């Protein structure tokens, strides 16, 4: 995706000899002011998304310099796009149960959302999850062997019996959540959440946050949660531990003798 945005920026034509600091700065400006998401609504790129794409561009510049394709180390001279600290919204266990008890316009959307709450999988990985990637373990349980779309990380992750039930009838091949579409995670998802009486701003990705915070709150160690989320560094997972600790502090302060 980062490549496609640079391709748009330079109209599909850019030679190594044309890479300069000025071009890099123009590309940074393009990402933050003009670039549009490829889908689903072609909205302007978010700040953090633009920052991630520009970081990929700088990585390519660094490799090009190391391979002597360009003479100057442009990556070290270019600045970066500052990321914004975003609030990670998540559901409590009670709210997840409320959702599970609330009818949804699309059953496949409901099953996929609850599956994300129980596994931490991103929407991109749920959409492409296939029955060929789910197999029975020697202990009688189930595993899924996936390659994540965002980070291209290969992982073998356990699936609980409840999560497997959400997949529907077990098949030998094909897409697990057949009929699930990205357009469903907009209005249909928000309508379902509202019908459940939940007033938080919840996106599909919040179900991944929900999985992480609930696991930590219920005692799973941070290193295990990090592996389950396929994070490359436990520092990324630490954010969820901080969220849980913040909630604990809030609850502790609710009881007062004054």
Model-derived regions: residue spans:
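DNA/chromatin major-groove-contacting recognition/catalytic segments
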Residues: 98, 155-158, 169, 242-258
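Active-site/catalytic core of tyrosine-dependent DNA strand-transfer enzymes
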Residues: 160-199
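N-terminal DNA-binding recognition helix of tyrosine site-specific recombinases/integrases
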Residues: 2-25, 33-76, 122-124, 191
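C-terminal catalytic core of tyrosine-transesterase DNA break-rejoin enzymes
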Residues: 66, 114, 118, 125, ...
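Conserved tyrosine-mediated DNA breakage-rejoining catalytic core shared by Y-recombinases
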Residues: 18, 77-80, 86-89, 93-94, ...
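Basic, Lys/Arg- and aromatic-enriched nucleic-acid-binding interface segment
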Residues: 43-47, 51-53, 66, 70-123, ...
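Catalytic-site neighborhood detector that most strongly recognizes the C-terminal catalytic loop/helix
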Residues: 90, 148-152, 182, 229-254
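Short, polar N-cap/turn motifs at the start of nucleic acid-interacting alpha helices
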Residues: 133-140, 199-200, 220-239, 246, ...
